[in-house]
From Swiss-Prot:
Reactions catalysed according to its record: AMP + diphosphate = 5-phospho-alpha-D-ribose 1-diphosphate + adenine
Major location category of this protein: cytoplasm
Function statement: Catalyzes a salvage reaction resulting in the formation of AMP, that is energically less costly than de novo synthesis.
Recorded name of the encoding gene: apt
Protein location: Cytoplasm
Entries under SUPFAM superfamilies matching the protein: PRTase-like (SSF53271)
Protein name: Adenine phosphoribosyltransferase
Length: 177
């Protein structure tokens, strides 16, 4: 059974008109979770994308990022919501469709020039991924690639990210969302 068929669609969540792509049904299934990690691991091993550390976006990016860090033998750095990291942080505020949000990283998370694989569960508008990339770059890191389980190409995030010159990879797409 392919990855896409293991992802639950919840209509009208979190608001009317949204088709929410819920990966919890995929990752609770040990075969599904293994497919995600094995396929992403194979992609990064076989495509010559060089990176030093994996940066995962809160919260589901932690699940993918932690497992990939283990299989690829790389360290893991979290991007968190404000107030969740105990030491000195660098913060970035970014715009959402209706409002704004903030993310943070420890100031000592990266070494200047360190190459990063940025991961999250889903790519929609691209706002959070681009904010995380800007935060990585603010700390002197270089975004080597971005990886997602799900891409919603019709929402526009993929185009925004590619237009900024970033390399992206996703395991599956849901068109029309």
């Amino acid at each position: 059974m392919p990855i896409k068929s293991r992802i639950r669609t919840v209509p009208d969540y979190p608001k009317k008109g949204i088709m929410f792509r819920d990966i919890t049904t995929l990752i609770k299934d040990p075969v599904g979770f293994r497919l995600v990690i094995d396929n992403m691991t194979q992609h990064y091993l076989s495509n010559g994308i060089d990176f030093d550390v994996i940066v995962g976006i809160e919260a589901r990016g932690f699940i993918i990022g932690g497992a990939l860090s283990y299989t690829l033998g790389k360290g893991f750095v979290p991007v968190r919501k404000p107030g969740k990291l105990p030491a000195d942080v660098v913060q970035l505020e970014y715009d959402l469709e209706y409002g704004s949000d903030k993310i943070e990283m420890h100031t000592d998370s990266l070494v200047k020039g360190q190459r990063v694989l940025l991961v999250d569960d889903l790519l929609a508008t691209g706002g959070t991924a681009l904010a995380a990339a800007a935060l990585v770059e603010k700390l002197g890191g270089v975004v080597a690639s971005m990886g997602f389980i799900v891409n919603l190409p019709d929402v526009g995030g993929e185009k925004k990210i590619r237009d900024k010159g970033y390399n992206i990879f996703s395991l599956t797409e849901f068109e029309g969302d």
